[in-house]
Amino acid sequence: MFERNQKTIFVLDHTRYFSISSEQYISMDYLKGKPVQETPASGSSSMVVGTQLSKSLWTCAVESSIEYCRIVWDLFPGKKHVRFIVSDTAAHIVNTWSPSTQNMSHVSNAMMMVSVPSRSIPQSSDYSVIHGLRAAIEALAEPTDEQLLATQVGCKQIPNKGRVICITSARDNTSMKSLEDIFNTVLLQQNALVAPPSKKGLQIDHCHLVILNIVPLGVESLVTNRNLLEISPLLDVEIHTVNAPDISDKLLHLIMGHYDLASTTVTNIPMKEEQNANSSANYDVEILHERAAHTRVCGPDFTLTTSIKPGTTYETVTLKWCTPRGCGSSDLQPCVGQYNVTPVDVTSRPSSCLINFLLNGRSVLLEVPRKTGTKTTSHMLSARGGEIFVHSLSIARSAMDEAPSISDGPGGRVSDYRIPELGQLFKMSRMVPLKTKPKGKCSQGEHLWRRLPRYFPRTTNVTILFNLQRQLNWLPHFLHLIVKEDMDKQDEVRCQQQIHELYKSASRGDMLPFNTTNNARPKVGKTKDQYRLFYRELEQLIQLNAQTPHHKNLLESLQSLRAAYGDVSSKLDPGASHLRSYTESPLSPERLEPTSSASNSSSSILKASKRRMSSSGQRSLLDMISIAERSQSNKRLDFSGRLCTPLGQTAKLYPDFGNKEKDILTPGVVTSNLKDESIRS
């Protein structure tokens, strides 16, 4: 309810330095009066030069800060509060948290009375921005009307956060560090004053201090920029050094992050030309509003295109003006939200024309720039009660629409989802809270959650293993044992027997019992491919659940069976590519094509060792090189230090390195030094 942006306080430095020029000159041409003539160096002719004016640093600071609060009060009328404090020899309060002073006219009239600092002010330590920062902390402790109402209702804990924007000019980073330390100290002192039992205000939960270091145009500053930094649990500080003419753009960029705003540029607005009323031209107007106006209209499956305008650092969404036309409510999409809007440049002619057009009771539809032939209307601008709103129209699937069927996939209708099996997986993965906290870093539920869904084909056309559960009576119990985490020796023997029976069926040429519409027996090559895919999917399932040594023994047996069945060669089978397209799972390993026929003896397969699998006929080049290097290294003597070191200790390399006495007594070292001297001579 009470966010950090509910309270914002501007502290304006009113010292002598802010009376100097910003060094950005504006040429003024007068309609009346004699123009100033300037004779060039050649002296042959003269040219008319208009008067050049320049704003002071104080004027730039006041204009930009008032523009900041105008945007806040336009978008959040009566909800967000902004205060101003002017600091010179003391802190001057411009307005309070009262709604009667939270308006543009009150702040503008007060700033006119303050005026620009005088250059005749003597340089003194009494003129400081610290007075204003102290007053800002005291103002944060004062409750707003909403906080007072919450106190009367009976709220015991009222959040109190705020932001302080200090516009000043510091000499270097040391001065900035001193300013931060003083602000943090005063913040702690203020919280100590309002602590019980005094209760002279609200305790400040957190403060965000933004320091804008202002310098004239073309002047180098010794203060470096710094991103948001946590000084203490109560204070975050960020520092920005900007030229005085650019302070408005900087505050516009900051306000979008402070209040979570977004920018929209309305393009192709037809307007009459001032010089020629019979013709019209297209203009663009940039408006600000809450970011939710874009996020709510899009939904999760649609995004609006953004761009960065020249001279800015933030993104803006471009929407095209749609010619107003009469249409009924049935022609419009449902509205999902409305938000206040305000123009970025309120004094420009295009902005003024758009505001007057809307305040006269007209509505404007905004459409997304077309990428296809269809027209998508995403927003609508209208005014009610003197305020302008942007309405977000739903262009994604509405909550009132019927949800699409689960079988309607992106590639068309999918009718073979394994929905019952997925329900069983949910039941197996269901967790309930425990009364006592489990011991250890990883609970049993988290371990189960990580292990169960590692391999689950979503559709029936990508798996052979799970399609045969109804046809093979032993397969469901076999799969249950594979997934079983605490497999014992008896379970391993049962699985070994089933693998043995499966290989015997493959050796006899028995076809797998698929449900087929006709009783035609598949060809021999096709039957082998089915068994080969069955083996591969079964191997992947065992490999993902290999938690015990019994699982690993099963995996080695199955790998031996696959190797003997001929599933290790790169010879291409004519029908294998076609089978792969509809029988292979997406999570299956890389395909291994068959070669020559295997032996029919199942007992020899199960007893085959790894040495037989890696025989000379199947060894790779890397295996042969590794064996040669290993045999060559065995012929060399081991490191003498390792041979002399007792077992369990570490041998030290160069034990006498760095020992000066040892170096002097070593004749080899002396000889080498003499040789070096002779070479140099």
Curated annotation (Swiss-Prot):
Pfam families: Mat89Bb
Annotated localization: Nucleus; Cytoplasm; Cytoplasm, Perinuclear region
Keyword annotations from UniProtKB, A to Z: Cell cycle, Cell division, Coiled coil, Cytoplasm, Developmental protein, Differentiation, Meiosis, Mitosis, Nucleus, Phosphoprotein, Spermatogenesis
Motif (Nuclear localization signal (NLS)): 606-612
Region (Disordered): 574-619
GO-annotated cellular components: cytoplasm; INTAC complex; integrator complex; nucleus; perinuclear region of cytoplasm
A GO biological-process term: oocyte nucleus localization involved in oocyte dorsal/ventral axis specification
Disulfide bonds: none
Post-translational modification: Phosphorylated.
Family stated for the protein in its record: Belongs to the Integrator subunit 13 family.
Function (record text): Component of the integrator complex, a multiprotein complex that terminates RNA polymerase II (Pol II) transcription in the promoter-proximal region of genes. The integrator complex provides a quality checkpoint during transcription elongation by driving premature transcription termination of transcripts that are unfavorably configured for transcriptional elongation: the complex terminates transcription by (1) catalyzing dephosphorylation of the C-terminal domain (CTD) of Pol II subunit Polr2A/Rbp1 and Spt5, and (2) degrading the exiting nascent RNA transcript via endonuclease activity.
Subunit structure: Belongs to the multiprotein complex Integrator, at least composed of IntS1, IntS2, IntS3, IntS4, omd/IntS5, IntS6, defl/IntS7, IntS8, IntS9, IntS10, IntS11, IntS12, asun/IntS13, IntS14 and IntS15. The core complex associates with protein phosphatase 2A subunits mts/PP2A and Pp2A-29B, to form the Integrator-PP2A (INTAC) complex.
Protein name: Protein asunder
Name of the gene this protein is made from: asun
